[in-house]
């Protein structure tokens, strides 16, 4: 109560922020006459002037009012559009490492031009991040005339570009592209074999459109680049034939319960698990197919791979539905993004799940993949010096943006008041009754000429509703992952008089629905339109626009509540843009996924006891509140998944930073002979310690063993026993020095034979190739450790602490192995110039030609495992991505200085 009173007196934090920003808006508006008086050439010269002032010590904040006034004036001249005051406020929020919530139709694309221009003045590059290629290309082309007028270069980064094109794209002042492509380019750059193969510059400023979709919805799925592993497609096919023979076990208190089944399904956690009865039955089936030995168990250590195949097959059959989670296209399984409804060609599920789904659908099974590089969006975007984002729906996730990314959310007021009417939810007992009510609502809208947008949560539901409308002779268009190519055209005309559009998840569509249809799209279809034709089309559109306004504007129908309130708000937000009238209503049934999983059985029982007749619905604020509480539960659980994923990935991220930093230093250094010398002394010293322990008696020495080891590992044939026999005073330290001297002489002799330059190039090539091979193996080891670490919870140990400790041990072992392998190769090999060229060519071919897969890994199962093991609370993460100094503590957690720990390689 006291906090509410204080808010009324001094305003909310959001109000105070807006009040401060409005003062700067007044400054910008006061400059407008001054900039209007400038000629085009004088206005264009401002960019060079600002850059010069930056070099002389002024800051971007000091330049902001003038820079924004410059862009606003240029926009008036190039586009005939003037930035509203609320767009200036949004731009200032975006420039200050915050998230701007701007409602649909408020001009986010135009708003982004202001902070993009300001931050591009530094010459360090700006990345404008969108959720798909279509929007990246569209926004780049739409804003190119404005930026070109101001002397800025613009380019677009999309899949399918070669390295040269990508390098040009990143060299531009402002680069538009998708979150996936920026992330994968970062990983590819850290797999390059020469500096010329890298395409990205240091990461400066990222401006993320639909920021909630990128940083929250997709944060659960790490970006993974993988290469082919061994082929096991036959086993997937054999296991796939067995899964349909298993019987699902239902809850004992349900009508479907028929006794103990073979597996249980946990839809909430996306898990399918064999029961004890199921384990016995599966073992019998496997033995019958000669996949398991008679006396063997599925859970023995030798059958881990077989168990993995069974689990993948079970999940494929029970949790992943065709036309909901994926579609079959050209004999391939194509994943459907659950958040945007878009297909993701080229993306594959990990952990053998994709192969299991391929076996289930009878399409060609592609090889399993081994991880070569991976990163989460959370850790990728925290690499930028400045990060900001905009979306129509961020306020419900403001806590997460602050907790994970350290980004505050500011709600930007609309330019015109919002007049959309949001009606209460209608809840029916069955889906059939719900769809009947939806059809009647649509029929009423069509009769009065009101356009309707119907939102569904899956392709399957959109096609089901489309079939019902077709039977009822109601003309309509369908917008889902199957009809990608027609997407922009369908959205552009969804505001036509009486139009009916069915759409899977509207998040990220990025195209405004203009009431009366999009007259600009009609003009674009004409070849060289005359002024008269344009005027006629505009006049005809104005008539249609007024008719649609009179009919009530765009009506939104939700056929099901999504698991996130934010996605529901995105659907609603398609209506009521720029003060237009509109309305929205959600129709639900007790058979909907969200209601079935999270709404209690008591609600269904209560509805039946109330004597509800067929076709009747419940509409009450209590019901709507109960549904929102269910959504909050899901949102909280998904937040836990994302935070848990980040906590585990942060361990790998610390190691990734060390490896990638060392790798980049290797690429940029032509001479690593000093590093090789230090490593060689370390490796020889460690080997000598094994056979001649420090400060030990001579009787404890294993000299013959040391001789054999030096020869086998390093090609070093030294008569150690003869040396000791000839020299009584050859003590431990002297012997060490003599061995190292001999090793150094032999290496120097090798350098004389092949030449300094050839050996330097060979050292670098060997170091890179060995590091990449070991890093790949280390990632696989980390994956295996990650999958089983939750079991430590049963032993009353903290799985995260155990993971940190063991991953550090693995990382230390990897670096020791790297030093030993590099020294061994360089010592034993007989180098010739053509060997160096062959090795470099082999690396180049591997880099360019190796088939790679770009995937999103599933994360739900990880959280389910951790919940089962009873994990402890989470920690808060803040942005902290500074470059590691040589005297800083090593990020691996050892407590040593970086230069004395994992920095010693470089």
Curated annotation (Swiss-Prot):
Q: Which organism is it from?
A: Aeromonas salmonicida (strain A449)
EC number(s) from the headed UniProt entry: 7.4.2.8
Protein name per the record? Protein translocase subunit SecA
Tell me the GO molecular function terms: ATP binding; metal ion binding; protein-exporting ATPase activity
Keyword Transmembrane listed? The answer is no
Task: Report the membrane topology from the UniProt record.
Answer: Peripheral membrane protein
Question: Gene for this protein?
Answer: secA
Taxonomic classification, please?
A: Bacteria, Pseudomonadati, Pseudomonadota, Gammaproteobacteria, Aeromonadales
Q: Name one GO biological process term.
A: protein targeting
Show the catalytic activity.
ATP + H2O + cellular proteinSide 1 = ADP + phosphate + cellular proteinSide 2
| Top EC class, one word | translocase
